[in-house]
């Protein structure tokens, strides 16, 4: 796989199941080592498909977990997490336990935890895949708002081609296993983007056609 992401870019990666999208994120985050080739990347944090919130911790303590692992004092870690909660629409839920939160709220807490890692690159693995359509659309907008306040380079893995086009600056399309980049689509459209925009529909069809051709080879 030959791939790059510019600083501050939101790069979406789409491809069929089993093509190596999650493995790619794990390589970027240093959780796996490449068997060949080279990888150059700024420090990166992974937000996995499941939120993995610890049930015995409050929302704010879950978000502050990366800071605590980095030996930031508990009070300071909570203060930083609470400040981010206020910015990201989580104010008032600081002391809630995970089971008291909706799926969308849990994902917001998980994203806050990833942000508080302080890494320059965020790797998001299907962050909205388990959510209903309405909540998913709300969180897509929320993600862009959050990144406008806390800019990062983002690599977003998704099975949803439309989601990729709505959110990303560029979409990399992978072939079936063994995954390789078979297309890179620049999304030079202003935000917010609407699903019904003719340009979005055209780009979605282009991406789906590339995916289909890759599967048939």
Feature-to-residue mapping (PLM):
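The feature captures the beta-strand-to-loop junction immediately N-terminal to the Walker
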Residues: 14-16
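Conserved ABC ATPase "signature" region
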Residues: 75-93, 145
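A short, proline-enriched helix->beta-strand linker immediately N-terminal to the Walker B motif
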Residues: 116-120
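Short coil-to-helix segment of the ABC ATPase nucleotide-binding domain corresponding to the Q-loop/switch region
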Residues: 57-64
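Catalytic Walker B motif of ABC-type/P-loop ATPase nucleotide-binding domains
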Residues: 122-126
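Helix-to-loop junction immediately C-terminal to a conserved catalytic motif
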Residues: 29
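Conserved ABC ATPase signature
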Residues: 97-101, 105
């Amino acid at each position: 796989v030959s791939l790059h992401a510019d600083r501050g870019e939101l790069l979406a990666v789409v491809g069929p199941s089993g093509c190596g999208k999650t493995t790619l994120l794990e390589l970027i985050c240093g959780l796996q080592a490449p068997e060949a080739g080279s990888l150059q990347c700024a420090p990166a944090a992974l937000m996995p498909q499941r939120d993995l919130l610890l049930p015995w911790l409050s929302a704010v303590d879950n978000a502050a977990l990366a800071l605590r692992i980095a030996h930031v004092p508990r009070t300071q870690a909570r203060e930083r997490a609470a400040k981010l909660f206020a910015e990201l629409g989580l104010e008032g839920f600081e002391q809630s336990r995970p089971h008291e939160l909706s799926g969308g709220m849990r994902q917001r807490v998980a994203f806050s935890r990833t942000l508080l890692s302080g890494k320059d690159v965020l790797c998001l693995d299907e962050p909205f895949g388990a959510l209903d359509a309405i909540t998913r659309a709300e969180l897509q907008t929320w993600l862009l708002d959050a990144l406008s306040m806390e800019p990062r380079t983002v690599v977003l893995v998704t099975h949803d081609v439309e989601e990729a086009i709505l959110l990303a600056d560029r979409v990399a399309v992978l072939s079936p296993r063994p995954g390789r980049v078979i297309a890179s689509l620049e999304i030079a459209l202003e935000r917010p983007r609407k699903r019904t925009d003719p340009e979005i529909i055209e780009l979605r069809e282009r991406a789906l056609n590339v995916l289909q051709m890759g599967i048939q080879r």
